[in-house]
Amino acid sequence: MKKNLFLVSVFASLFVGTANNALAYPMYAQQGYENPREATGRIVCANCHLAQKPVDIEVPQAVLPDSVFEAVVKIPYNQEVKQVLGNGKKGGLNVGAVLILPDGFTMAPADRMSAELKEKVGKLYFQPYSEDKQNILIVGPVPGKKYSEMTFPLLSPDPATNKKVNYLTYPIYLGGNRGRGQVYPDGSKSNNTVYNAAAAGKIAAINPTEKGTDVVIDKVDGGSVTVAIPSGPDLLVSVGDTVAADQPITNNPNVGGFGQGETEIVLQNPARLQGLVIFLGFVLIAQVFLVLKKKQFEKVQLSEMNF
């Protein structure tokens, strides 16, 4: 329990905004959701990462039971861009991913991984989403420049020992992000998003603060309202400007985003493969006999013609 609380506090500090780390995806999904994939198919990380970006996943077409294989996850982005960090400065993007495997599929244990696979995995640390969801793996945040492509070491189940698993085609779901989110789990905005005018009116004052800027708007219907803007977004308005309600008064500094992908994998029955090999062997033998029989028949015809 103490270890879990420590992990939560560590990743919470990453979210709130140290200068060197990005939004602590996907740890916040762990804290707030029993399952990261909603009934609609939407992965909950999209609640905080509002921009849509592509992701890609590559797995074998089929695997045998109780075998180690790899899933290659790609989270592409322009590695020349910088994002707004929690303190308002600019820095590199981090990436994170959640891989939702079929029930029974898990992360491969180290003693089952080949030296080549270990080299591909590198220093990435994967962990199950929860104790009862060993088939859902999460990783990150990690530096995007080094890990925009990740290799997940996976282990397929064996229906002979796990009666809940069958030889079928199964879906695999991926969620991947690059960069910090725009909304915190409590619904409040981060400093990595656009800020809008709280009411229609005129910009009366722009006051620098310790954490950013306060923009005071004299409302059309009287009174005033203050929009607190944290360090990060750039102001688009000046004192004296007229603004409409919900009009953007800052740029959108977000350069990252979240994406979902899916693929399929077949848990192949070895007996079926053996049967297929035997069948193909019989077909090959039959073809050979047909060729030999045809040649024999041609020889007989030729000899009769010569006679």
Curated annotation (Swiss-Prot):
Q: Where, in this chain's numbering, is heme bound?
A: 25, 45, 48-49
Q: Name one GO biological process term.
A: photosynthesis
Question: So where does this one cross the membrane?
Answer: 273-293
Cellular component terms per the entry's GO annotation? chloroplast thylakoid membrane
Record text on cofactor binding: Binds 1 heme group covalently.
According to its record, how does it sit in the membrane?
A: Single-pass membrane protein
GO MF annotations in UniProt: electron transfer activity; heme binding; iron ion binding
Q: Which HAMAP family match?
A: Cytb6_f_cytF
Q: What subunit structure does UniProt give?
A: The 4 large subunits of the cytochrome b6-f complex are cytochrome b6, subunit IV (17 kDa polypeptide, petD), cytochrome f and the Rieske protein, while the 4 small subunits are PetG, PetL, PetM and PetN. The complex functions as a dimer.
What family does the Swiss-Prot or TrEMBL record give for this protein?
Answer: Belongs to the cytochrome f family.
Query: What role is this protein assigned?
Result: Component of the cytochrome b6-f complex, which mediates electron transfer between photosystem II (PSII) and photosystem I (PSI), cyclic electron flow around PSI, and state transitions.
Please report the name of this protein according to its UniProt entry: Cytochrome f
Question: Which organism is this protein's natural source?
Answer: Ostreococcus tauri
Gene name as annotated = petA
